[in-house]
Amino acid sequence: MLNQAAKMGIPCLIQEQNSYAGVTNKLLAKKAERICVAYDGMEKFFPAEKIIKTGNPVRQSLLSSTIEKDEAVKSFGLDPEKKTILLVGGSLGARTINDSVMQHLDLVENSDVQFVLQTGKYYHAQITDTLKGRQPKNLVVTDFISDMAAAYKAADLVISRAGASSISEFCLIG
């Protein structure tokens, strides 16, 4: 689409979310009038005169949320008096995170902390089947979290895949 738009004289821009430019964006950069980047030093991949440092897009709900920690923890059915660890692998999930939790269920169950595990849609059925009849009370399992502002607010610690969007959100929320 960008190639066609450029041929038609329509101004185009691309957005590179990562600190290392992908092959596609490096190729598309030739057609783009501007290249929005999240990090300094992107001149090694793109012409400096085309670069605009915009940062990565983040969910507006993270900025506008007013939920308090106790309310956020309770929204997951957990105890506000206990520490909470949020484990997220993105919307598709992260097999290594899910497998680690499943391999250490005894540690999870005997822990003084509580856990929210976002499995991702792909792994959810497998995880819930594995947990049938043996899910620890301090472990909440969900395929997807629609209110990430509440999830982040509830968490004392986040264990996550290192995606560009996730890292940008962590920088925003602290």
List the predicted regions and their residue ranges:
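Short glycine/serine/threonine-rich phosphate/pyrophosphate-binding segments
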Residues: 1, 94-100, 162, 166-169
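Alpha-helical segments flanking ligand/cofactor-binding loops in enzyme cores
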Residues: 3, 25-26, 106, 168
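Active-site-proximal region of nucleotide-activated glycan assembly enzymes
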Residues: 6-70, 78
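Short loop/helix-cap segments at secondary-structure boundaries that form the rim of catalytic
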Residues: 26-29, 41-50, 126-134, 151, ...
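Donor-nucleotide binding loops and adjacent catalytic segments primarily
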Residues: 67-74, 78-157
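A donor-sugar binding/catalytic signature common to diverse glycosyltransferases
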Residues: 148-174
